[in-house]
Amino acid sequence: MKLNALTYLSLATFSLLVYAACSKDAKKDDPSDVPNPVDSAWTTITDSTINTNNLLVNSSTCPNAPNYGDSIVYVKPKQGGDFFANPVNNIGVNGTYFSWPDGLKINKNSGAINLSQSESGVRYNIAFVKKGTKDTCVSQLIVGGLSYMDAIYVLDQNDTLAKPIFNADPFATSVCDASDDTDYPDNNGNGNNKCVFDDDLPGQKANDQKLRVRTKSGIINLKKSVEDGLFGKNPKNGDSKKVQIRYELNDASQKANQKIAVQVVYYDKASNIPGATQQEVASKRANMLTYKIVNGKPRPPLIIIAGLKK
């Protein structure tokens, strides 16, 4: 899928007029090693510094908008070092790159992205300010991979399964096969040729911590996780656990070893979940479902388990 439009975006912190331009280059991303990449300080931009109310579409005014050859880039297996994606435009053009939301490791001088150290499955805004100008050219880029939707799951409503989403598209068909409750490592589950989940060292698997991740589909059985002791024998309101899941996908990432951490929180009843937390989840879900940037910190996904609705 090619970039067909970029955006003007007004950045409140700098009071700059932000322009967007479409990608005209049909080349695929051409990643290469970049020695000692510098993490851009701009990656700390937060919701309060960005005014998205003036988001406009324009396809011709900003040729310096970062172009990585495609709208999705993927980490790939690499021996001896990290894997990078580089912009295919702005060659020889001096300026500064930055990105938001948090999670992208980008060289502020060259625009090189360290995909091995970036959060995957996330949609990012990437901006470039040409030296000697005040024009901030912005484009969107997705780092391919999976995520889980920020959500509240109510077990007594039979809402028990957290399903992965791929390449920041909540409506995309899964690249993995379906599987059931026979598909766990302690039942000799170890994925298949399409997808492998939770292939980690003994004792470090998500399933070893009682987060029941199916190895072929990546689906998390939340009810089984609680029953098997994710939060201990007697979980309490607000109990929380951050768990890492390793995975490999047989897609454009060519089975590169990737990982995602999820934050799982327990409440006895949905009515016990703090209002601010409910609003945070609702806001992130709304952005994800409408293909918008999830500003601030989209990682880790927040999975809230409530035993009862009321």
What is the predicted function of each stretch?
Residues 103-109:
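Short beta-strand segments within Ig-like beta-sandwich modules, predominantly Fibronectin type-III
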Residues 1-35, 40:
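Bacterial Sec-dependent N-terminal signal peptides
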Residues 25-98, 141-210, 255, 260-310:
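Solvent-exposed, low-complexity, repeat-rich "mucin-like" stalks and linkers
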Residues 120-135, 139, 227-251:
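A short beta-strand micro-motif common to beta-rich folds, especially ectodomain repeats
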Residues 96-98, 106, 124-128:
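Secondary-structure-rich domain cores
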Residues 109-123, 205-240:
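Extracellular/luminal low-complexity segments enriched in Ser/Thr/Pro
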Residues 113, 126, 141, 218-220, ...:
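Hydrophobic beta-strand residues in large extracellular and virion-surface proteins
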